């Protein structure tokens, strides 16, 4: 077996499959594009679903890739096991309706065992297979695999919902008896026992059925096009080929671990407690790649995942004695390790470091808050005479403040308290169940549509015309091909068409189809790409249509021009964003409609009003500069040399279109555009908002809509000026400010009067002191305007020794507000209010010294006040 670096393994994999006629698919962005079923790209096949479900037919049915992936189902296990990672690389080879089982197994065995390639010893390889899949068993035998090395496993059948499915065969490497101390042997495989002896290095999925959840597996229909989907983990291959005990001792992780040793002054012990080193090395890889791909830490979705990873890594850094910000210092090391295939980490190093460091600094402040929360919890335990920190509280420290359980346990034990491990596990499981229920594993591939996939007739989109005559090649009605149609809805393919099929954020054209008499025979309501790339027109049929007949195709020209204004403006906006807020502000999605444009981009904070003003000004300057717009068809490399910006998540063919707007903007784009920027007329941003962690959205309008937006603003300003009696529009702001200042002064004066009134009223309330169980208490209903006034009462009460406990109730509108304050350790305000609040159909809580609740049944206020003596 050859001893190869991870970069050599990756390259040898790709070279082998290229020698078998495969094209190399570049690694896709970790942030999925147009796939709501995925939080992250989580496998090599995730970006190829369009090929497997038949919605797109690839130019080459043989594909290979090395795909960066992220899975975060069990973050808490990372660092505890030898092979668990958040970010990993999946090596794959795929056949879309081309070769199948025989070639997949034979070539796979060749790659693994040939001296020209990986040169694995054959006697160290074991394979599992689906018991009913005798063909795979026989093919392995034909390759020279001993029957004793073939293990039937009932679970070796791959399916996720409706769509492609089939048996799979897995390949394992036997590391020997040293990794099998109990000498269990092949039962480890047969019974799926977690072990370090048999390492799964490759899974070959034989996708041959269309899974249908409504029928038994034995009744699944064969796919019209059988597929091969395989996945081999680079980290596992590297561990085996480099003789590493775990994945972390490979060249993918050790350089990071060495840097952590320098930062911490601690030494990594392969056989000792090294969890913190592993966590940091794993998490900084995921953070570096994900942030480089446009995801940013936040409080929801993938942003929350990144925040959790970073905080977990920081806490493990603290366990190693690293108390300052340090993670950002590891980004260059990650980039250097992966540079040969993923240069983007080093290219975006400054931005990634900036985001990581800023998030570390924010978390440092959060840690202080978490420590304060823990101190409060421990003080509460002491006051209640308890000795165990509840699981739900431990989970809150873990989930909200990023405290690992080990840290909470250590701090609690130092203070003399135990922790509720089982309660924590229960709370953790509830969260995991919620997370798993919310995500479809990998996403269903979807059923293959044989009718659409069978369209092979050529069709060409003509960019430079709004109308042309063309022959009707294909009619599909009720999902079947037909020679003619006279009513209902149908799908049509023409030899050539002026209708743009929806793509790249630009909506489809609409229009009409006419016969040779000039009569409209169909209305085009949508155009999408067929699996083989032809524009597929969805039409409402008004009169007879037949294959082989020529028709005149006319798009709605006015609508197209409006869409083009927005699309061309989108390119200008993209360039302006780069200039004003930074190169990191790359496109994360767009929509160019007739009435508006919508542009999503990566950015870590709201765009300020001043920045929006500069962006809007810059776009309009380019419109007024009347820049010539040119399009060039060339190859991708030449386009990049021209400075063309490739858009987020897009895949490009051999020939690409470069859209250039003067010397201001150069992008790869397959859409339609104006001839000159001046045709846009005017550009106006109408909204900027956040749509997720690290993603912002701008909605803008152009031309007539932009003029109307400005006019509406002017009308609104005129109304305001009239209301505040400003003599001119320019005076309106000063008038509004003066009114605001006056209102603030009045509100302040009003608040002061309320405080004086409350203080006066408090004198009467605080006179009515009662006693029960040796505790002096005041329980009274008060007439106040809001809950804030109750707190003012409590503040006044604290100033003197009126009583030990204060209970106030107020009916405010339709709600009942309750306040409990306590000066004695014998009465916990938070616990007391939990007993009182249900009386008025409410609930609440709080700290030992202060608690509040809200209720809805004012008729029970007297009952609540009477209950105080019993509860106190």
Curated annotation (Swiss-Prot):
EC number: 6.1.1.7
Presence of keyword Zinc: yes
GO biological process: alanyl-tRNA aminoacylation
PROSITE patterns in UniProt: AA_TRNA_LIGASE_II_ALA (PS50860)
Cofactor annotation: Zn(2+)
Alphabetical UniProt keywords: Aminoacyl-tRNA synthetase, ATP-binding, Cytoplasm, Ligase, Metal-binding, Nucleotide-binding, Protein biosynthesis, RNA-binding, tRNA-binding, Zinc
Record note on cofactor: Binds 1 zinc ion per subunit.
Subcellular location field: Cytoplasm
Annotated Gene Ontology cellular component terms: cytosol
GO molecular function: alanine-tRNA ligase activity; aminoacyl-tRNA deacylase activity; ATP binding; catalytic activity, acting on a protein; transferase activity; tRNA binding; zinc ion binding
UniProt superkingdom: Bacteria
EC class: ligase
Reaction(s) catalysed (UniProt annotation): tRNA(Ala) + L-alanine + ATP = L-alanyl-tRNA(Ala) + AMP + diphosphate
Keyword presence, Zinc: yes
InterPro entries referenced in this protein's UniProt entry, alphabetically: aa-tRNA-synth_II/BPL/LPL (IPR045864), Ala-tRNA-lgiase_IIc (IPR002318), Ala-tRNA-ligase_IIc_anticod-bd (IPR018162), Ala-tRNA-synth_IIc_core (IPR018165), Ala-tRNA-synth_IIc_N (IPR018164), Ala-tRNA_ligase (IPR050058), Ala_tRNA_ligase_euk/bac (IPR023033), DHHA1_dom (IPR003156)
UniProt cross-references to CDD domains, sorted A to Z: AlaRS_core
Binding-site positions, Zn(2+): 567, 571, 669, 673
Function: Catalyzes the attachment of alanine to tRNA(Ala) in a two-step reaction: alanine is first activated by ATP to form Ala-AMP and then transferred to the acceptor end of tRNA(Ala). Also edits incorrectly charged Ser-tRNA(Ala) and Gly-tRNA(Ala) via its editing domain.
Family: Belongs to the class-II aminoacyl-tRNA synthetase family.
Domains: entry comment: Consists of three domains; the N-terminal catalytic domain, the editing domain and the C-terminal C-Ala domain. The editing domain removes incorrectly charged amino acids, while the C-Ala domain, along with tRNA(Ala), serves as a bridge to cooperatively bring together the editing and aminoacylation centers thus stimulating deacylation of misacylated tRNAs.
Protein name: Alanine--tRNA ligase
Species annotation: Streptococcus pyogenes serotype M3 (strain ATCC BAA-595 / MGAS315)
């Amino acid at each position: 077996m050859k001893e190869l670096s991870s970069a050599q393994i990756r390259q040898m994999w790709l070279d082998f499959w290229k020698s078998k006629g495969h094209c190399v698919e570049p690694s896709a962005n970790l942030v999925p594009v147009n796939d709501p079923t995925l939080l992250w790209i989580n496998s090599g096949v995730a970006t190829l679903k369009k090929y497997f479900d038949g919605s797109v037919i690839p130019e080459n049915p043989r594909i290979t890739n090395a795909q960066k992936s992220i899975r975060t189902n069990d973050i808490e296990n990372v660092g505890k096991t030898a092979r668990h990672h958040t970010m990993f690389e999946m090596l794959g080879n795929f056949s879309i309706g081309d070769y199948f089982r025989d070639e997949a197994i034979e070539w796979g065995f060749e790659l693994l065992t040939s001296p020209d390639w990986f040169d694995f010893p054959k006697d160290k390889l074991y394979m599992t297979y689906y018991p009913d899949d005798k063909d795979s068993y026989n093919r392995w035998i034909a390759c020279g695999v001993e029957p004793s090395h073939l293990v039937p496993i009932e679970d070796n059948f791959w399916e996720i919902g409706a769509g492609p499915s089939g048996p799979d065969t897995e390949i394992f490497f036997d590391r020997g008896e040293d990794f099998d101390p109990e000498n269990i042997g092949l039962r480890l495989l047969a019974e799926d026992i977690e072990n370090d002896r048999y390492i799964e290095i490759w899974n070959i999925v034989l996708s041959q059925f269309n899974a249908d959840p409504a029928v038994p597996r034995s009744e699944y229909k064969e796919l019209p096009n059988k597929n091969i989907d395989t996945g081999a983990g680079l980290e596992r291959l590297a561990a085996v080929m480099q003789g590493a005990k775990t994945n972390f001792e490979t060249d993918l992780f050790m350089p990071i671990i060495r840097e952590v040793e320098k930062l911490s002054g601690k030494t990594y012990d392969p056989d000792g407690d090294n969890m913190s080193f592993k966590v940091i090395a794993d998490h900084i890889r995921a953070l570096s790649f994900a942030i480089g791909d446009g995801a940013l830490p936040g409080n929801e979705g993938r942003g929350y995942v990144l925040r959790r990873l970073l905080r977990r890594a920081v806490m493990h850094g603290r366990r190693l004695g690293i108390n300052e910000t340090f993670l950002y210092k590891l980004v260059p090391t990650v980039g250097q390790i992966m540079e040969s295939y993923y240069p983007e980490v080093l290219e975006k190093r400054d931005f990634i470091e900036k985001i990581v460091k800023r998030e570390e600094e924010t978390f440092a402040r959060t840690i202080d808050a978490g420590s304060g929360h823990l101190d409060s919890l421990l003080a509460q335990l002491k006051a209640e005479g308890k000795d165990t920190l509840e699981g739900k509280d431990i989970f809150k420290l873990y989930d909200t403040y990023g405290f690992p359980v080990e840290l909470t346990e250590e701090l609690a034990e130092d203070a003399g308290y135990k922790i509720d491990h089982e309660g924590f596990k229960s709370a953790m499981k509830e969260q995991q169940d919620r997370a798993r229920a919310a995500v479809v594993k990998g996403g269903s591939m979807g059923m293959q549509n044989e009718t659409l996939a069978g369209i092979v007739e050529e069709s060409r989109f003509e960019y430079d015309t709004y109308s042309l005559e063309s022959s009707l090649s294909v009619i599909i009605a009720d999902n079947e091909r037909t020679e003619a149609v006279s009513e209902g809805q149908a799908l049509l393919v023409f030899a050539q068409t002026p209708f743009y099929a929806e793509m790249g954020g630009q909506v489809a054209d609409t229009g009409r189809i006419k016969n040779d008499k000039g009569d409209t025979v169909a209305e085009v309501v949508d155009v999408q790409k067929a699996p083989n790339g032809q524009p597929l027109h969805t039409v409402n049929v008004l009169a007879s249509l037949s294959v082989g007949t020529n028709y005149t195709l006319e798009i709605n020209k006015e609508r197209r021009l409006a869409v083009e204004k927005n699309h061309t403006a989108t390119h200008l906006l993209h360039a302006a964003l780069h200039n004003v807020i930074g190169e990191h502000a790359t496109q994360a999605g767009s929509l160019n409609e007739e009435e508006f444009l919508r542009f999503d981009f990566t950015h870590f904070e709201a765009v300020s009003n001043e920045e929006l003003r500069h962006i809007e000004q810059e776009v309009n300057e380019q419109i007024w500069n009347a820049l010539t717009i040119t399009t060039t068809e060339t190859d991708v490399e030449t386009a990049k040399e021209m400075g063309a910006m490739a858009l987020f998540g897009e895949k490009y063919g051999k020939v690409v279109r470069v859209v250039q707007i003067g010397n201001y903007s150069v992008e790869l784009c397959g859409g339609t555009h104006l001839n000159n920027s001046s045709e846009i007329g005017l550009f106006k941003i109408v909204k900027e908002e956040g749509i997720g962690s690290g993603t912002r959205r701008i909605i803008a309008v152009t031309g007539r809509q932009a003029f109307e937006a400005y006019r509406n603003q002017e009308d609104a300003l005129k109304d305001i000026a009239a209301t505040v009696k400003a003599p001119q529009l320019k005076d309106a702001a000063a008038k509004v400010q003066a009114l605001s200042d006056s209102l603030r002064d009045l509100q302040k004066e009003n608040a002061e009067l309320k405080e004086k009134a409350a203080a006066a009223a408090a004198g009467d309330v605080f006179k009515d002191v009662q006693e029960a169980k040796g505790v002096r208490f005041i329980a009274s209903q008060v007439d106040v305007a809001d809950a804030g006034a109750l707190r003012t009462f409590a503040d006044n009460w604290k100033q003197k020794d009126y009583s030990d406990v204060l209970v106030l109730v107020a009916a405010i509108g339709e709600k009942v507000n309750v306040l409990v304050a306590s000066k004695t350790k014998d009465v916990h305000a938070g616990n007391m209010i939990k007993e009182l609040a249900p009386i008025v159909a409410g609930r609440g809580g709080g700290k030992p010294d202060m608690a509040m609740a809200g209720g809805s049944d004012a008729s029970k206020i007297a009952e609540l006040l009477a209950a105080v003596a019993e509860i106190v």
